[in-house]
Protein backbone atom coordinates (compact mmCIF):
# COMPACT_ATOMS: atom_id res chain seq x y z
CA UNK A 1 0.00 0.00 0.00
CA UNK A 2 1.34 3.43 -0.89
CA UNK A 3 2.28 5.68 1.99
CA UNK A 4 -0.05 8.70 2.25
CA UNK A 5 1.30 12.09 3.19
CA UNK A 6 -0.21 14.10 6.03
CA UNK A 7 -1.73 16.52 3.53
CA UNK A 8 -3.36 13.66 1.61
CA UNK A 9 -4.84 12.27 4.83
CA UNK A 10 -6.18 15.69 5.84
CA UNK A 11 -7.76 16.13 2.40
CA UNK A 12 -9.45 12.73 2.78
CA UNK A 13 -10.74 13.70 6.25
CA UNK A 14 -12.14 16.97 4.89
CA UNK A 15 -14.37 14.97 2.54
CA UNK A 16 -15.86 12.88 5.38
CA UNK A 17 -18.97 13.70 7.42
CA UNK A 18 -18.77 14.05 11.20
CA UNK A 19 -20.44 10.69 11.64
CA UNK A 20 -17.92 9.03 9.31
CA UNK A 21 -15.06 10.70 11.19
CA UNK A 22 -16.50 9.57 14.52
CA UNK A 23 -16.70 5.98 13.26
CA UNK A 24 -13.13 6.27 11.94
CA UNK A 25 -11.87 7.45 15.34
CA UNK A 26 -13.64 4.56 17.12
CA UNK A 27 -12.14 2.05 14.69
CA UNK A 28 -8.69 3.68 15.03
CA UNK A 29 -8.93 3.47 18.83
CA UNK A 30 -9.91 -0.21 18.70
CA UNK A 31 -7.25 -1.12 16.15
CA UNK A 32 -4.36 0.55 17.97
CA UNK A 33 -5.61 0.27 21.56
CA UNK A 34 -5.50 4.02 22.17
CA UNK A 35 -7.99 6.69 23.13
CA UNK A 36 -8.61 10.09 21.56
CA UNK A 37 -9.50 11.62 24.94
CA UNK A 38 -7.47 14.66 25.90
CA UNK A 39 -4.80 13.90 28.54
CA UNK A 40 -6.04 16.84 30.62
CA UNK A 41 -9.48 15.24 30.97
CA UNK A 42 -7.90 11.96 32.07
CA UNK A 43 -5.75 13.72 34.66
CA UNK A 44 -8.74 15.64 36.00
CA UNK A 45 -10.86 12.52 36.48
CA UNK A 46 -9.25 11.39 39.80
CA UNK A 47 -9.95 14.84 41.25
CA UNK A 48 -13.67 13.99 41.19
CA UNK A 49 -13.19 11.98 44.39
CA UNK A 50 -13.11 8.43 45.67
CA UNK A 51 -16.73 7.68 44.77
CA UNK A 52 -16.03 7.88 41.05
CA UNK A 53 -12.86 5.83 41.38
CA UNK A 54 -14.77 3.15 43.31
CA UNK A 55 -17.36 2.89 40.56
CA UNK A 56 -20.06 4.76 42.48
CA UNK A 57 -20.29 7.72 40.14
CA UNK A 58 -24.05 8.13 40.46
CA UNK A 59 -23.55 11.26 42.56
CA UNK A 60 -20.77 12.70 40.41
CA UNK A 61 -21.71 15.26 37.80
CA UNK A 62 -21.41 14.06 34.24
CA UNK A 63 -19.10 16.17 32.04
CA UNK A 64 -19.80 14.57 28.65
CA UNK A 65 -23.26 14.20 27.19
CA UNK A 66 -24.90 12.60 24.19
CA UNK A 67 -27.67 14.61 22.52
CA UNK A 68 -30.33 12.08 21.49
CA UNK A 69 -33.06 13.03 19.02
CA UNK A 70 -36.14 11.13 20.21
CA UNK A 71 -38.52 12.41 17.53
CA UNK A 72 -38.77 15.22 15.01
CA UNK A 73 -42.38 16.10 15.81
CA UNK A 74 -44.51 17.97 13.28
CA UNK A 75 -41.79 20.34 12.08
CA UNK A 76 -39.43 17.82 10.51
CA UNK A 77 -37.98 20.30 8.00
CA UNK A 78 -36.97 22.71 10.77
CA UNK A 79 -35.42 19.85 12.74
CA UNK A 80 -33.45 18.71 9.68
CA UNK A 81 -32.15 22.27 9.22
CA UNK A 82 -31.08 22.42 12.86
CA UNK A 83 -29.40 18.99 12.68
CA UNK A 84 -27.45 20.20 9.64
CA UNK A 85 -26.37 23.34 11.51
CA UNK A 86 -25.24 21.37 14.56
CA UNK A 87 -23.44 18.56 12.75
CA UNK A 88 -22.39 19.93 9.34
CA UNK A 89 -24.11 16.95 7.73
CA UNK A 90 -25.41 17.12 4.20
CA UNK A 91 -29.13 17.36 3.53
CA UNK A 92 -29.51 13.65 2.74
CA UNK A 93 -27.56 12.51 5.81
CA UNK A 94 -29.43 14.89 8.13
CA UNK A 95 -32.81 13.78 6.72
CA UNK A 96 -31.90 10.10 7.19
CA UNK A 97 -30.73 10.77 10.73
CA UNK A 98 -33.94 12.62 11.65
CA UNK A 99 -36.16 9.95 10.08
CA UNK A 100 -34.31 7.18 11.93
CA UNK A 101 -34.98 8.73 15.38
CA UNK A 102 -34.26 7.96 18.14
CA UNK A 103 -30.63 8.59 17.18
CA UNK A 104 -27.68 10.42 18.74
CA UNK A 105 -27.07 13.79 17.10
CA UNK A 106 -23.96 14.71 19.07
CA UNK A 107 -21.85 12.39 21.22
CA UNK A 108 -19.57 13.14 24.16
CA UNK A 109 -19.98 16.91 24.09
CA UNK A 110 -19.60 19.35 26.98
CA UNK A 111 -22.65 20.07 29.13
CA UNK A 112 -23.14 23.63 27.87
CA UNK A 113 -22.83 22.58 24.21
CA UNK A 114 -25.28 19.72 24.80
CA UNK A 115 -27.79 22.05 26.47
CA UNK A 116 -27.50 24.61 23.65
CA UNK A 117 -28.02 21.86 21.05
CA UNK A 118 -31.03 20.55 22.99
CA UNK A 119 -32.57 24.03 23.17
CA UNK A 120 -32.00 24.61 19.45
CA UNK A 121 -33.53 21.26 18.47
CA UNK A 122 -36.49 21.70 20.81
CA UNK A 123 -36.99 25.20 19.39
CA UNK A 124 -37.21 23.59 15.95
CA UNK A 125 -39.93 21.22 17.24
CA UNK A 126 -37.94 18.10 18.16
CA UNK A 127 -38.08 15.96 21.28
CA UNK A 128 -34.55 15.62 22.67
CA UNK A 129 -32.89 13.94 25.66
CA UNK A 130 -29.41 14.26 27.10
CA UNK A 131 -27.61 11.17 28.34
From Swiss-Prot:
Keyword Aminoacyl-tRNA synthetase among UniProt keywords: no
Record keywords: Ribonucleoprotein, Ribosomal protein
Pfam family, one: Ribosomal_L12
Biological processes annotated in GO: translation
Domain of life: Bacteria
InterPro entries for this protein: Ribosomal_bL12, Ribosomal_bL12_C, Ribosomal_bL12_C/ClpS-like, Ribosomal_bL12_oligo, Ribosomal_bL12_oligo_N_sf
Transmembrane segments: none
UniProt xrefs under SUPFAM superfamilies: ClpS-like (SSF54736), Ribosomal protein L7/12, oligomerisation (N-terminal) domain (SSF48300)
CDD domains documented for this protein: Ribosomal_L7_L12
GO CC aspect terms: cytosolic large ribosomal subunit
Keyword Ubl conjugation attributed: no
GO molecular function: mRNA binding; structural constituent of ribosome
Known function: Forms part of the ribosomal stalk which helps the ribosome interact with GTP-bound translation factors. Is thus essential for accurate translation.
NCBIfam families per the UniProt record, alphabetical: L12
UniProt family annotation: Belongs to the bacterial ribosomal protein bL12 family.
UniProt cross-references to PANTHER family, sorted A to Z: 39S RIBOSOMAL PROTEIN L12, LARGE RIBOSOMAL SUBUNIT PROTEIN BL12M
Name of the protein in question: Large ribosomal subunit protein bL12
Species for this entry: Nocardioides sp. (strain ATCC BAA-499 / JS614)
Higher taxonomy: Bacteria, Bacillati, Actinomycetota, Actinomycetes, Propionibacteriales
Amino acid sequence: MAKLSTDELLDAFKEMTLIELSEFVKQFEETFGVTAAAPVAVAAAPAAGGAAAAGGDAGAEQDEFDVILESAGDKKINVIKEVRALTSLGLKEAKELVEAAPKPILEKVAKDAAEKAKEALEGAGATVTLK
